[in-house]
Amino acid sequence: MADVLSRFNSGKLWDFKGGIHPPEMKSQSNSQPLRHLPLGTDFYIPLKQHLGTTGNLLIKEGDYVLKGQALTKGDGLRMLPVHAPTSGTIKSIKPYVATHPSGLDEPTIHLQSDGLDQWIERNPIDDFSTLSPEQLIHKIYQAGIAGLGGAVFPTAAKIQSAEQKVKLLIINGAECEPYITCDDRLMRERADEIIKGIRILRYILHPEKVVIAIEDNKPEAISAIRNALQGANDISVRVIPTKYPSGATKQLIYLLTGIEVPSGERSSSIGVLMQNVGTMFAIKRAVINDEPLIERVVTLTGNKIAEKGNYWVRLGTPISQILSDAGYQFDKHFPIFAGGPMMGLELPNLNAPVTKLVNCLLAPDYLEYAEPEAEQACIRCSSCSDACPVNLMPQQLYWFARSEDHKKSEEYALKDCIECGICAYVCPSHIPLIQYFRQEKAKIWQIKEKQKKSDEAKIRFEAKQARMEREEQERKARSQRAAQARREELAQTKGEDPVKAALERLKAKKANETESTQIKTLTSEKGEVLPDNTDLMAQRKARRLARQQAASQVENQEQQTQPTDAKKAVVAAAIARAKAKKLAQANSTSEAISNSQTAENEVEKTKSAVEKTQENSTALDPKKAAVAAAIARAKAKKLAKTQTTLENNQE
């Protein structure tokens, strides 16, 4: 850190590698003073306008709000609040088109102005030194201030993280990108307030040196800042050569100190903190005037805009309304850019609102804009590498991005790319390198975010498993303690431990089983040891007697049911014989004889069946005997009918 200060105090300027000198085109907008646009009727305030997380809503649909009233609140310094740009009614809270080249929607508050522009109650102060550094940081946070130089990183978080490390505080007034002049005009017209904001920040951080760096193409701004200092030596002014991108953080630090910020680290790691001049003005307004960040200076430029210049624009104002108020000549063949020509983003929808990020709206005509030429193959001319101010190898990163070799992209320090656009500007093959690098960064971020969520889920799962195991162990311990308490209670009341008694019974049972399974032996007359089968033979005999007894019971049951059925069968057979005999005596004709013989045959069959039934009565079960008797009765009945018919015929 001492090396940083010694190099800075030498007064020397170092030149960084690469860089370009594109046409500045700043005279279009820097000749007119700051102006205000008419107050609009509808404002669209995105819930997140900074690099961080979205705040929590404080309002709902239908609420009436005042100018400067907080619409969201945060839980930390990286969750900045947003504020009402004017007084009016909340019409809706829903997705609305974002100020982004994707044209996607984002959660947005729709505020309809009442035209009164009535402020919320404010508490301005004259002397900021009456507040502690912590109180000042809190006021900066409550005002929703983010870096207005393009990064939109929460200012309070940046200050707090570097509070004990800063030796050199750099205020960036370089404004190196073509067309943009908002910082230039702000320094010319509000130099006193900018100096006041710088002194507030110096009071918080206590750096050893404070410097304002301004490019040499802004002589009016340099003069205004020096006049505002009035000879004070607590803040110095350092004029740097005009070169793009000298306003980038790492490049400006190298210009002033000759020291490079290590890859992957912040400038605070070498004792340097940098802030934009617009951010210093916002800090002064927040601390002294108690005004949140609800407006900023925006450059309106390009040949398609009639009233070029720099305007105070309320955050949330639709871009289409701003352009209309500035005399924009709509032409579908020419896009609108948010930002400058090098790092700006093409807007697909002009209904998108102005946010804290927007410092310029560029509307070029055919003299300033041409359709992108067809992309050609890389010829490896090294023009991009020679011009890169970060010492990267854009052609190699291009191949890695095309092949989605994310590991190689990271190895070649893609994260250090500041997206200045120089590589694409100098490429003779018209390769849109910045688009490839932005897409590759987004893919790597998605992969890491997915891995981060996976790791977090794994940690949560393992924590849950550990908790469940701990709870199970605690449950078992409670059960064991309760069981022990019950045993002790029973032991006190009955005089013995029930568990021990149960174990003793179990041991005794096992011992008996062991004895019963031992093989008994006896000694023969010859002295041989033979197995003693006495018990086994007794068991077999008992089983045999049990089977015989069961069979005898079944036989007795059958005999009790058979006599009745057999007697009925004998009676039926006797009746049948009597009828057949009578029929034989009565019939003298051959037909009668024949029928008599038939009847006798039937009788014989019946008799035989009955005799067979009688013989087998002991072998058949009662059910079969009954069936046989029924069949015999049916045959006898049929025979009787035949006899009656013959007698009638003889008469």
UniProtKB/Swiss-Prot annotation:
Compositional bias of kind Polar residues: 554-564, 587-600
Cofactor: [4Fe-4S] cluster
Enzyme class: translocase
Entry keywords, A to Z: 4Fe-4S, Cell inner membrane, Cell membrane, Electron transport, Iron, Iron-sulfur, Membrane, Metal-binding, Repeat, Translocase, Transport
Keyword Transmembrane part of the UniProt annotation: no
Bias (Basic and acidic residues) ranges: 465-477, 485-513, 602-614
EC number: 7.-.-.-
4Fe-4S ferredoxin-type domain span: 368-398, 408-437
GO CC terms, sorted: plasma membrane
Residues reported in the UniProt entry to bind [4Fe-4S] cluster 2: 388, 417, 420, 423
Keyword Nucleus appears in the UniProt entry: no
Subcellular location: Cell inner membrane
Gene Ontology terms: biological process: electron transport chain
Binding positions for [4Fe-4S] cluster 1 per the UniProt entry: 378, 381, 384, 427
SUPFAM superfamilies membership: alpha-helical ferredoxin, Nqo1 FMN-binding domain-like
Stretches for region Disordered: 465-565, 583-624
Cofactor binding comment, as recorded: Binds 2 [4Fe-4S] clusters per subunit.
Bilayer topology: Peripheral membrane protein
GO terms assigned for molecular function: 4 iron, 4 sulfur cluster binding; electron transfer activity; metal ion binding
Function: Part of a membrane-bound complex that couples electron transfer with translocation of ions across the membrane.
HAMAP family: RsxC_RnfC (MF_00461)
Family: Belongs to the 4Fe4S bacterial-type ferredoxin family. RnfC subfamily.
NCBIfam families: PRK05035.1 (NF003454), rnfC (TIGR01945)
The protein's assembly and partners: The complex is composed of six subunits: RnfA, RnfB, RnfC, RnfD, RnfE and RnfG.
Name recorded for this polypeptide: Ion-translocating oxidoreductase complex subunit C
Annotated organism of origin: Haemophilus influenzae (strain PittEE)
Gene, per the UniProt record: rnfC
